[in-house]
Amino acid sequence: MKIYMFMKKKDSKPYIVNMLDKDKITADVTKAKQLADMVIVLPHWGTEYVYTPDSNQNYWTQLFLSLGVDVVIGTHPHVLEPVEVVSDTKGHEMLVYYSLGNFVSNQDQKPRMIGGMAKMTLVKDETGCYVKNYNLTPVITQKLFGQKAITTYKLSDYTESLASGNAIRNDSGCSDFSLSYCQTLVKQILGDDYDESTSELNVSLHPDGLVKDTSATESSSSAK
């Protein structure tokens, strides 16, 4: 499977990533589609501390979809946001992780202790390349009382005992931080596909995976 990365800028500040620009994105995706088997976009976008995608994210999602992008993995809001599959009028489907939240954090509010690890199965066979299934594993930042130490646990490995020892409880309005709080918020954000018994969002798609239509130019979203 071929992978092609666009990151470095060709100007006087090559250490700064590209801003979201429609013309630049269109050119990059068009080139990437010629060079790679699949196109994955990782945008820095969205409104901080909000659990749902904003109008700006929706705009760029529709642009990515119209260009034939296969997967979007978003960051920046510092909290989890939903995961969904969107499709256009010609049948092309695109997987979107709107925000993975914080993998590790020293921020001072309960929701910012929760993040997620994206996982998906990409298949290449005689029919082409496609997403077979996708997953999100929630993670919890553990700040230790009296120590300058921070670590990360999978939510599936987290306990009420660990939660009671999380130094986030010292911060204003956070004394009730608990395992049940984390599970409730993750379920609220990820919806019915999230399985509290395994602490996983794990979605198996139809046998042929996501539909890939590289000629698609029109778009309208629908959630799976």
PLM regions and their residue ranges:
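Acidic, metal/ion-coordinating pockets
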Residues: M1-K224
